[in-house]
Amino acid sequence: MLLVNWTEMDNPKLQNIPDEGTLKALSKTIGNCAFSLGVELDVDIAEIESTMYEFKKDMFGQNFDILRKWQTMSGGGKTIRTLMHALWIVDRRGFDFLKKTYKIV
């Protein structure tokens, strides 16, 4: 299993909040992982289930809705770093996409 050295990824860009355009593009990059991603991002289970019901046959819609719900939840921590950490666990393509998008070494 590959590991990420998060101390080496101490780039100031990681503290930024991802914009909606990036989240839309990301939602089309990642696979069928909306439920797992929502759990990793601490989205309420009822909200995740609501998304799964509302976007039954729309994987990209599920992904984007989970990302949007995460971004609009109260509290801090809606950073690129938090999102990358969750994506490292559930979908490496999304992790690689954010690394490339934000030019993080």
Where are these regions (language model features)?
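Alpha-helical death-domain superfamily interaction modules
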Residues: Q15-I17, G21-T22, F35-V105
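Extended, non-catalytic structural segments that build the interaction scaffolds
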Residues: M9-I30
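Disordered regulatory segments flanking catalytic cores
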Residues: M1-M9
